[in-house]
Amino acid sequence: MLVSVFAILNKAHGMATSKTCNENLRDSMHIVLLGDSNTWLGGDDCTSKRGWNTWFAQSFPHATCVSYARSGATWTNTRRTTRNLTENVGRISDNNVIYNQVCRLIAACRNKQQAIPQLIIVAAGTNDAWFENKRPQAFSIQNATQLKAMPNHSLPDLPHTFPLSLAASVQYDCLLLKKHFPQTRIILFTPLQTTAVSENKIAQTGNIIEQVGHTLNLDVVRQDKICCVKRAEELKHFTNTYDGTHTNEQGAQKNGIILANTVAKLLKGGS
């Protein structure tokens, strides 16, 4: 599997990277992952086998692969969200949001603790769907058309008012990434299927993320459609998860390989 992914990437063209995407890619590509618990499971260094990112890192050519993911994270902000670079509570909270992972990444790069990434992957959305009571305005904007009708959010590093819907939060965070990492390829992963919420709710969440991503010319990977975790199967008996939501080692390995090949094709220029 590694050989096939590497072969695909060797043929890639036009990718935002400090070197041509060739046989030296393994030594030059720095990858950063943002996300929630299914990415957090792999550890910051992407070595724990219950996380998809560990198997992704084993299957995908890179120089470094670092995760800033936190368990319980959402895209969606709240009225009490503030910039916080240290909180790590392992559950949903006002400051456990992708925005703060973006801020941690920016700070790490400024402090020379993190190499400027050539690829950023953001895999989130499960908790936005699961804990809607904690994010009551998450689905107040249903699509990119409604988002365009809303006032544009400016992009200071410390906004006075955070966007409160899922759509606007995705837009804001991605624009912030694009501002600070203009040469970096950004790919969004929608949430996996889960027994915690209906397939329709996960699809709705994925649709919003996908539409916003496409308005920003970002690639979007629909994990709910291509990955191995299927709600119907997990409701019968846990197969690729240990609780219906979080991957076991088998599920993480399957997903990591699927995602490595999918990303490789995207970087090559395929769909």
Report each predicted region and the residues it spans.
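Short hydrophobic segments within beta-strands
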Residues: 34-35, 189
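Helix C-cap/helix->beta junction micro-motif
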Residues: 60, 180-181, 216
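Hydrophobic membrane-insertion alpha-helices, especially the h-region
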Residues: 1-7
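Active-site segments of SGNH/GDSL-like serine hydrolases
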Residues: 123-127, 171-206
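Conserved SGNH/GDSL esterase-like catalytic core that processes O-acyl groups on lipids
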Residues: 28-32, 38-149, 155, 159, ...
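Boundary at the C-terminal end of the N-terminal hydrophobic targeting segment
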Residues: 12-16
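Catalytic His-Asp segment of secreted/periplasmic serine-dependent ester chemistry enzymes
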Residues: 83, 191-271
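Aromatic/hydrophobic pocket-lining residues that form the small-molecule binding cavity
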Residues: 98, 163-170, 206, 252
